[in-house]
Swiss-Prot record:
The lineage of its organism: Bacteria, Bacillati, Bacillota, Bacilli, Lactobacillales. Signal peptide: none annotated. The gene is atpH. F-type ATPases have 2 components, F(1) - the catalytic core - and F(0) - the membrane proton channel. F(1) has five subunits: alpha(3), beta(3), gamma(1), delta(1), epsilon(1). F(0) has three main subunits: a(1), b(2) and c(10-14). The alpha and beta chains form an alternating ring which encloses part of the gamma chain. F(1) is attached to F(0) by a central stalk formed by the gamma and epsilon chains, while a peripheral stalk is formed by the delta and b chains. GO terms for molecular function: proton-transporting ATP synthase activity, rotational mechanism. It is found in: Cell membrane. It is a peripheral membrane protein. F(1)F(0) ATP synthase produces ATP from ADP in the presence of a proton or sodium gradient. F-type ATPases consist of two structural domains, F(1) containing the extramembraneous catalytic core and F(0) containing the membrane proton channel, linked together by a central stalk and a peripheral stalk. During catalysis, ATP synthesis in the catalytic domain of F(1) is coupled via a rotary mechanism of the central stalk subunits to proton translocation. This protein is part of the stalk that links CF(0) to CF(1). It either transmits conformational changes from CF(0) to CF(1) or is implicated in proton conduction. This is ATP synthase subunit delta. Belongs to the ATPase delta chain family. HAMAP family: ATP_synth_delta_bact. SUPFAM superfamilies: N-terminal domain of the delta subunit of the F1F0-ATP synthase.
Amino acid sequence: MSLDKKTVADRYAKALFELVDADNELDQTYQELIALRQVFEDNEGLDAALAGVQLSLDEKKSLIKDLQQGASKYVANLIQMVFDYGRIDCMVAIIDEFERRYDRKMKRMHADVTTAIQLDKQQEDQLKANLAKRFGANEVTLTKHVDPEILGGVIVHVDNKTLDGSLSSKIKQIRRLLVR
């Protein structure tokens, strides 16, 4: 039975996270993994090339050695193990899951924010502070979107939660109440 990508990513990320956390190498490993993810994102098709049949085994091993260059033993071992077990196509998913675990431990959160107009620095800082307080986070990173259709206010997506404080949704609520 073949495991899906999410299950594979969860297992590898959990094992690596627990290992480096116990060895006090969490921050260093996190930084290395973010850099490794960037390599995969900058070289679209790298995972497919390493998993596919276009390259010889020697060519693949050479690429793996290049990826391991300068990496800690933890990251180098992860790369080797994922390659050896034919799961290199899961590498970015593994790193994403590791980052989720890291963020949870460090009380960091990522929020998708939609506003009708561009937020200025003060508004952005205030929103970050409010979200940090509401969700108990030490650090908040915003991904900002501007959508004039919401008319005003803000829509925030965090994890699987949506906080809709937009003017357009308020108008829709009032309209529904009046139609009754």
